[in-house]
Regions:
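C-terminal catalytic domain of Rieske-type non-heme iron oxygenases
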Residues: 1-252
Length: 252
């Protein structure tokens, strides 16, 4: 399956970058990705984000029966409007895309849940009814969110063994005017706060694994389902890169 059907309705070629943030997290790239894929910390660490984004493992293909049934209603309604959203993951776990319902009928990941951009939507996506949030992950370096009013793109890039650059971009309809159609603080405040909170968690994790007392433990099958998928992809990819006696000799 290709990603194009999921993204075409948003017409990102006619969107513009309203804001860009760059921070360097004090942790290894792999820790940054694992932190992003793990669900345990959200309730206590992300008060802004969890106003609208559900603490659910549906985004990795897990979740309970009631959650799945509720999500199926949203997906079917969107498909009837020509907006794909059914969960799909590549065979090697590298890429995943799906649509999710935001909490309390929220339209956007803002403090209030109301659209950050008013009067305009991305591409052909309708403002009503609620179409939720399309999530796109692609290892090793990006996760993305697409709501009717704006899109978010995140990219991680290793800087050193203990430093990782995170670049975040907020995209809005090309015709949207700052101060008229959207307020920059309203647009960015949730994820600016979330990025800062995650950065602190990553730094703490980096300190923890550097301790001589550190021992890795098992992952929780439900709440860390996304981490397991990432680790499975990581291990399989590293193994392929190291296949062959010659390559292993070079590494040695």
């Amino acid at each position: 399956m290709k990603l194009e059907p999921y993204l075409v309705p948003f017409d990102l070629s006619n969107a513009k970058v309203a804001f860009e943030s760059r921070i360097v997290e004090r942790g290894n790239w792999k820790l940054v990705m694992e932190n992003n894929r793990e669900c345990y910390h959200c309730a206590t660490s992300h008060p802004e984000l969890t106003r609208t984004f559900p603490e659910s493992t549906l985004h990795s293909g897990a979740g309970g029966d009631a959650e799945r049934a509720d999500l199926e209603q949203l997906v079917e309604a969107c498909e009837a409007m020509g907006l794909p959203g059914r969960f799909w993951i590549s065979d090697d776990n590298q890429c995943r895309v799906m649509r999710m319902r935001l909490l309390a009928d929220a339209r956007s990941m803002t403090i209030t849940g109301k659209p950050a951009v008013t009067g305009k939507t991305l591409g052909k996506v309708p403002a009503e009814p609620n179409v939720g949030d399309v999530l796109l992950y692609h290892f090793p370096s990006t996760w993305n969110h697409f709501t009717a009013d704006h899109a978010l793109s995140f990219r991680v890039l290793p800087v050193s063994p203990t430093e990782t650059e995170l670049v975040s971009k907020w995209l809005v309809p090309k015709g949207a005017v700052e101060g008229v159609d959207y307020d920059l603080k309203v647009l960015t405040e949730v994820w600016l706060a979330t990025n800062e909170q995650d950065s602190k968690l990553v730094a703490q994790n980096q300190q923890g694994i550097a301790s001589p007392a550190y021992e890795p433990g098992p992952y929780a099958p439900q709440q860390e389902h996304g981490v397991i998928q990432f680790i499975d992809w990581y291990c399989a990819t590293i193994t392929k890169r190291l296949e062959g006696a010659g390559k292993l000799e070079v590494v040695a």
